[in-house]
Amino acid sequence: MGSKLYIRTFGCQMNEYDSAKMADILLSEKGMELAETPEEADLILFNTCSVREKAQEKVFHDLGRVRHLKNSKPDLLIGVGGCVASQEGPEIVKRAPFVDLVFGPQTLHRLPDLIDARRRTGRPQVDISFPEIEKFDRLPPARTEGSTAFVSIMEGCSKYCSFCVVPYTRGEEVSRPLDDVLTEVAGLAIQGVKEVTLLGQNVNAYLGKMINGEIADFATLLDYIHEIPGIERIRYTTSHPREFTARLIEAYQRLPKLVGHVHLPVQSGSDRILAAMKRGYTTVEYKSIVRKLRLVRPDISISSDFIIGFPGETEDDFEATMKLIDDVHFDESFSFIYSPRPGTPAADLPDNTSHQIKLTRLYRLQEKIQLNAQAISQGMVDTVQRILVEGPSRKDPGEFCGRTDNNRVVNFAGHAGLTGSFIDIRITAVSSHTLRGEISDMQ
C-alpha cells in the first residue's frame, strides 16, 4: 500500500487548483494516494491564503492541532504551502520547528524534490522562490472525474493595489503559452469535461506566447478554446476592470459558449477611495464597461468584490458605493471589512473609523445586494434554464443540482444518470441563495 497524503486548502479557486496539482504530482512521482483525515496521512499539507486578517495565526493554530501526530508516527512530514508560506518563509519553521516543508505557490512542482531532500538531510526544506512559469512544465497532465474543471492560465499580479498582498506572495504576472493552455483544455475535454473555468489573479491580463512568436491576449485565448470540441461552457475568474478591453467585450457577442456571468471586482464606489487603493479606474469607467457588456449581452449577470472600511472611508464614500450598487444592479458580491496586510502601503494609513460603523456599513451593503439578487432570481421563475448537472445537492443528497448560465445553483428532483449532462429546467421557486426547478417537458 502506498503512502497517504492529506491536503487542507484555504482561500480562493487558485488554491483549489494548486492543491489538485499537488495531489497529481505526488501521485505521479511518489505513488501517494489521498487520505480522508490527517490521522491517516504520511504527509500533511496546508495550502494557505493570506488575503484575510490573522491568516498567519490561523495557520499556526492548525499546525498545532496536528503536531501530536508525530509522536505516534515519527516519519510523518508536515508542510505549509500557498501565500502564507510565501509571505512568512523560514519564520514558519522558527515558530513551528516540527514543520518539514515550506513552499510557495510557484514552487509546488518541486514538492517531490523537497520531500527527498528532507528525508536525506533531516533538515526542514524552504523554497519560496518565484521561478516564473516553470511549475507548469513539471506538472503531470490534468486529470478529472467530473464535467467541470479549473485551468490556470496565468500566475501572479502586477497591479500592486495598495491593500493587496498578492504581488508579494505570488509574484508578478506571468502567462502560460497559448498552446500549453489549449493542450490542457483539450485533454480535459477528452476526459468528459464540458465546462472550464479559466483562473488567474487578473485572468483578463493574459498575454500568452504563440508558436509563431506573437502574443495572444485573453480574447484570442477565448476564441481558441471556443473551438475545442466537447467544451460547451467557458467561465473565468477573477477579472480586473483595467484589463477589460473592447475585444473582450466583443467576445460576449460572438462566443455563445462564454457564459452570461462576469465577476468584476470594483472594491468601492468612491473615486477618492479607488485612487487611495490604486485601482487605476473611476466609477464612470467601471460603469462604462458594464454598460457596454449589457449592450452585447443584455441579460448578463455581474458580481463583484467590495472592501468596506478602507482607511479614510467616510459616510459619503460609503454612500457612493451604495449608489454604484443601485446603478449596476450587482447580482452577488464577496464583501469584507478591510483588514491591513503586513508590507502593503495601505497598512500604514491612519484608520479612524470604528469597527461598529464598519460592521453596520457591511450589513447594509450585503442586504442591498441580496435584495438585488432576489429580484433577479424572482425574474427567472417560470423560465426554462439550461443547466449542467453537477451531482447530488449538498443540502439534500436525495436531490440533484446544477448551475445556470448566469451562475445560479438550481436544486431539482433527478437521478444520478443526469450527472454531467446539460438539461432544461423550469424554475419554480426561489430560496435565499438557490433556485428550485423541475425537469422541463421540453426535454
Curated annotation (Swiss-Prot):
Cofactor dependency: [4Fe-4S] cluster
Record keywords: 4Fe-4S, Cytoplasm, Iron, Iron-sulfur, Metal-binding, S-adenosyl-L-methionine, Transferase, tRNA processing
InterPro entries in the record: Elp3/MiaA/NifB-like_rSAM, Methylthiotransferase, Methylthiotransferase_CS, Methylthiotransferase_N, Methylthiotransferase_N_sf, MiaB_methiolase, rSAM, rSAM_horseshoe
Domain (Radical SAM core): residue spans on this chain: 143-375
Annotated Gene Ontology cellular component terms: cytosol
Enzyme Commission designation: 2.8.4.3
Compartmental location: Cytoplasm
Domain called MTTase N-terminal: residue spans: 3-120
Pfam families in UniProt: Radical_SAM, TRAM, UPF0004
GO molecular function: 4 iron, 4 sulfur cluster binding; metal ion binding; N6-isopentenyladenosine methylthiotransferase activity
SUPFAM superfamilies with a match to the protein in the record: Radical SAM enzymes (SSF102114)
Main location: cytoplasm
Binding site for [4Fe-4S] cluster 2: C157, C161, C164
Domain of life of the native organism: Bacteria
Keyword S-adenosyl-L-methionine: yes
Cofactor comment text: Binds 2 [4Fe-4S] clusters. One cluster is coordinated with 3 cysteines and an exchangeable S-adenosyl-L-methionine.
Location of the TRAM domain: 378-441
Catalytic activity: N(6)-dimethylallyladenosine(37) in tRNA + (sulfur carrier)-SH + AH2 + 2 S-adenosyl-L-methionine = 2-methylsulfanyl-N(6)-dimethylallyladenosine(37) in tRNA + (sulfur carrier)-H + 5'-deoxyadenosine + L-methionine + A + S-adenosyl-L-homocysteine + 2 H(+)
Residues at which [4Fe-4S] cluster 1 binds: C12, C49, C83
Similarity comment: Belongs to the methylthiotransferase family. MiaB subfamily.
Protein function: Catalyzes the methylthiolation of N6-(dimethylallyl)adenosine (i(6)A), leading to the formation of 2-methylthio-N6-(dimethylallyl)adenosine (ms(2)i(6)A) at position 37 in tRNAs that read codons beginning with uridine.
Subunit structure: Monomer.
Name used for this protein in its record: tRNA-2-methylthio-N(6)-dimethylallyladenosine synthase
Organism: Nitrosomonas europaea (strain ATCC 19718 / CIP 103999 / KCTC 2705 / NBRC 14298)
Lineage of the organism: Bacteria, Pseudomonadati, Pseudomonadota, Betaproteobacteria, Nitrosomonadales
Protein's gene: miaB
